[in-house]
């Protein structure tokens, strides 16, 4: 019974943290080289059409409900340099998976 209840309460989608990287031209040991991407908007698309968006909140955290399947991931507005990684994700039915995204700032 408990297993059935747990399965019924499972939310299909993703959650995690979005960071910007690098935040400075030279990364040094002991000095953070990334930062939470508060306010970043992730766009999850299927078959070339935007399915849903998620905005990173405090600490770069995001949560998004998605149907099971494969999605392309991009930023809104589109990144002129770098982009977001990973660019493709798979959502499994009945699973609320943890997936962190990194936005490449293009700083070198």
Positions of PLM-derived features:
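Sec-dependent N-terminal signal peptides
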Residues: 2-9
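Short, ordered, surface-exposed loop/turn motifs in non-cytosolic proteins
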Residues: 14, 20-47
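Glycine-centered loop-to-beta-strand initiation motif
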Residues: 16, 56-64, 101
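Short hydrophobic/aromatic-rich beta-strand segments that constitute the beta-sheet cores
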Residues: 44, 64, 73-75
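Short, acidic Ser/Thr/Gly-rich low-complexity loop/linker segments typical of extracellular
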Residues: 46-59
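Surface-exposed loops/turns
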Residues: 58, 67-68, 93
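A short, solvent-exposed beta-strand micro-motif common in secreted/extracellular proteins
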Residues: 69-79
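Structured interaction patches on ligand/partner-binding surfaces of diverse proteins
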Residues: 78-106
């Amino acid at each position: 019974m408990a297993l059935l209840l747990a399965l019924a309460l499972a939310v299909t989608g993703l959650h995690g943290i979005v960071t910007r990287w690098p935040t400075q031209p030279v990364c040094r040991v002991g000095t953070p080289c990334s930062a939470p991407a508060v306010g970043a908007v992730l766009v999850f698309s299927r078959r070339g059409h935007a399915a849903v968006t998620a905005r990173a909140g405090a600490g770069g955290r995001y949560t998004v409900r998605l149907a099971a399947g494969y999605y392309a991931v991009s930023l809104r507005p589109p990144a002129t340099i770098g982009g977001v990684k990973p660019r493709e994700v798979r959502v499994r039915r009945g699973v609320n998976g943890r997936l962190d995204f990194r936005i490449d700032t293009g700083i070198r």
